[in-house]
Amino acid sequence: MKIDFYYWAAQCPINYETLSLFDKYKDKIDIHTYNVEKDFDLAKSVKMFFPFLTVLNDEERFRAPLKSSLLDKLLNNEKCIEKPYIIDFGKEKYKGDIIPLTKDNIYMVSKKCTLSDSVCSCDKKALFLSKYCDEIFGYLNVENDNVLGGAEYISSKYVPYNIPKNDDYAFLTCLYHSSTDYDYKYYPLLELEKYLKNKYSKIYAITDAVGTFPNGNLQWFLEHGYVDEGVISEEKGYCKLHLVSKNI
């Protein structure tokens, strides 16, 4: 079995966890890894719009995080079907403490944004973001030291995906977490937009039409002042990705 794993450096903490996982399977699987941080042409050629993309045997594409259980099934020739995560979003906006996300508190997202509560993965993400962002990476919605939601960004000119790139454009890398109970995303995104308007004129994001990942869904963005720029990629049976934007 062959795996081609494309990843955007340490933009997502799961990337580091996945690379560590591969060490355990290097004698069982033909694994090739590609960091697209500086290779925009490669990201475009494989139609990459997630922080990581797995291609199995040069054919089957997976966007979900890889786990040992999945790799073991694949090694046993078991069929693994990736399904979109679709929920009814809670409408009531919930506001805890809205605080800046920085290198000093990025460890807080480890329980929600990693597969193994890996603080080390988050530290690597902080090093990555420090190359491209100011001191503030985004904003968190926090209650009792528990991260409820968050919004993160990077300048569009550093994004390897095939999106509009300009010094005046920001890109929303992560918007989390979607819930059936409350809207935890609204307030951190609102605070991030206020922060970014001092430097940028527009913010772009990628979202699925109906699924929760990435950042989704489209209707949520439309209800919060974003404009649908159209479909940029479609993964049959899994997602239809839209580019959305908002003048700030």
Briefly describe each language-model feature range.
Residues 1-26:
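Local sequence-structure signature of Cys/Sec-based thiol-disulfide redox active-site neighborhoods
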Residues 57-84:
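Non-catalytic, surface beta->alpha helical segment in thiol-disulfide oxidoreductase systems
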Residues 140, 146-159, 171, 176:
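Conserved beta-strand in the GNAT
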Residues 173-184, 209-210:
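A short, internal acetyl-CoA/4′-phosphopantetheine-binding micro-motif in the GNAT/acyltransferase core
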Residues 181-197:
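Conserved acetyl-CoA-binding loop-helix of GNAT-fold acetyltransferases
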Residues 196-212:
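Conserved GNAT acetyl-CoA-binding A-motif
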Residues 209-230:
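Conserved active-site alpha-helix within GNAT-family acetyltransferase domains
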Residues 231-248:
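C-terminal "cap" of GNAT-fold acetyltransferases
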